[in-house]
């Protein structure tokens, strides 16, 4: 068995609360989001893991989540690598719009297709497949080698960037990943074999509140 990979979706952001398409826009966490990140950190502290390195996106809501988690596990000065390859899916022309307003403008069915299809992007934005096309190569070249070296690696990122990873790690179909929702602030602990396949997966919290 090789190293450990922990994935955490950022806590609730201001725009999650306001029901806005966020994407690459950069709101911070709400009070609830801070609580969620702290809860995830407390779960990891209780689990007893100490990390060798952390990765996060170029967006403040993921970076803030990571900082809160690292404080909880007693590693505030851990090496942290930030890269936009781990950013949320880019919603293009939908970014900043209220989801109800978007449905009024383009129709509920069209917005549903943009949100929930695998390979149909919104205007000027990315599909889930597009998101995976930047996340997965970054994982393979930057993150996975450290896990396979036996390190314990923490990744704090976003719903869709993490779904892109989980799709491959959990061997989900396109239909399976579209049905997958990740709760905010809930760590997923993967232990990997030396051949990079998953040896075990443990969820430290409740995924039933995912959205």
From Swiss-Prot:
Substrate binds at residues 9-16, 22-23, 61, 88-91, 99, 115-116, 159-160. It catalyses: (2R)-2-phosphoglycerate = (2R)-3-phosphoglycerate. The record marks 158 as: Transition state stabilizer. Keywords: Gluconeogenesis, Glycolysis, Isomerase. GO terms for biological process: gluconeogenesis; glycolytic process. NCBIfam families: pgm_1, PRK01295.1. Catalyzes the interconversion of 2-phosphoglycerate and 3-phosphoglycerate. This is 2,3-bisphosphoglycerate-dependent phosphoglycerate mutase. It comes from Rhizobium etli (strain CIAT 652). The gene is gpmA.
